[in-house]
Regions:
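Alpha-helical segment of the N-proximal tetratricopeptide repeat
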Residues: 2-34
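Structural signature of tandem alpha-helical TPR/SEL1-like repeats
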Residues: 18-30, 52-64, 86-98
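Structural marker of alpha-solenoid helical repeat scaffolds
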Residues: 34, 68, 85, 101-102
Length: 117
């Protein structure tokens, strides 16, 4: 019996919650192959790649989320973090500003802008 996409997603999220990001990427990559247009899977995979410091892969996943959901404030913030880790502060700041505009109550978004301005 094969695992459902949802069970793979849940397994990946559980691994993330336990601090096992590398294991999370395995389950989440399988889920992504089945449903590549599912933003929740792509976001969780981006988080997993970010936690294992695979900045390029994290960037790619957060960009995919934004293609699927352009107004996802967290995806803009997370993409900014991945870009910042790659030394692309100006590009990161643009995404922090978008995230902060979309969700002005999220102080941590505004803090990243102040840190880079």
């Amino acid at each position: 019996m094969s695992e459902s996409t949802y069970s793979l997603f849940q397994l990946g999220k559980a691994h993330l919650e336990r601090g096992m990001a590398a294991q999370a990427t395995v389950a989440l990559e399988k889920a992504k192959k089945r449903e590549p247009d599912k933003a929740s899977i792509r976001e969780a995979l981006g988080i997993a790649y970010f936690r294992i410091r695979n900045w390029d892969a994290a960037e790619s996943e957060f960009r995919a989320v934004l293609e699927l959901a352009p107004t996802d404030d967290y995806a803009h913030y997370a993409l900014g973090r991945a870009l910042e880790q790659q030394g692309r502060a100006a590009e990161a700041n643009g995404h922090y500003k978008l995230a902060s505009t979309m969700r002005p109550d999220a102080e941590h978004y505004a803090e990243r802008i102040r840190d880079l301005d």
